[in-house]
């Protein structure tokens, strides 16, 4: 239910090969000032073939996402991929805060 709600309230991008989904990403945005890029995923056996690059280019060039002041994302291992598209480390991380409810999905 939580996954479906997150998809329903996001701009979602899928990558398909022979009718099988091999990639996904979603953007949470107000379409005016800010966007959060999240849940970028390519199935393991398709990685290393430029699919993630194509997906990021597609998202960054999507007409409704042009002119935003700020994009943000969290990534554990793809910093170099995003740097190719102009992403940088947060200039002043001391200004950023988060509220992380680690138990929100527990029942």
Where in the sequence are the language-model features?
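A conserved beta-strand-loop-helix scaffold within acyl/acetyltransferase catalytic domains
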Residues: 2-42
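Conserved acetyl-CoA pyrophosphate-binding loop and the N-cap/start of the following alpha-helix
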Residues: 46-55
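Hydrophobic alpha-helical segments of small multi-pass membrane proteins
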Residues: 42, 55, 74-77
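Intrinsically disordered, low-complexity, positively biased terminal segments
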Residues: 43, 57-66, 107
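Short loop segments at secondary-structure junctions
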Residues: 18-19, 45-46, 60, 100-103
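Conserved active-site alpha-helix within GNAT-family acetyltransferase domains
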Residues: 65-72, 76-101
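Short amphipathic alpha-helix that is part of the acyltransferase structural core
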Residues: 1, 16, 93, 106-107
């Amino acid at each position: 239910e939580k996954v479906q709600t997150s998809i329903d309230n996001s701009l979602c991008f899928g990558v398909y090969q022979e009718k099988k989904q091999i990639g996904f990403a979603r953007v949470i945005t107000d379409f005016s000032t800010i966007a959060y890029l999240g849940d970028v995923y390519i199935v393991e056996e398709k990685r290393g073939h430029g699919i993630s690059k194509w997906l990021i280019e597609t998202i960054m060039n999507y007409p409704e996402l042009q002119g935003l002041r700020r994009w943000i994302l969290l990534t554990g291992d793809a910093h170099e991929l995003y740097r190719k598209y102009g992403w940088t480390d947060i200039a002043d991380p001391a200004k950023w805060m988060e509220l992380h409810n680690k138990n929100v999905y527990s029942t």
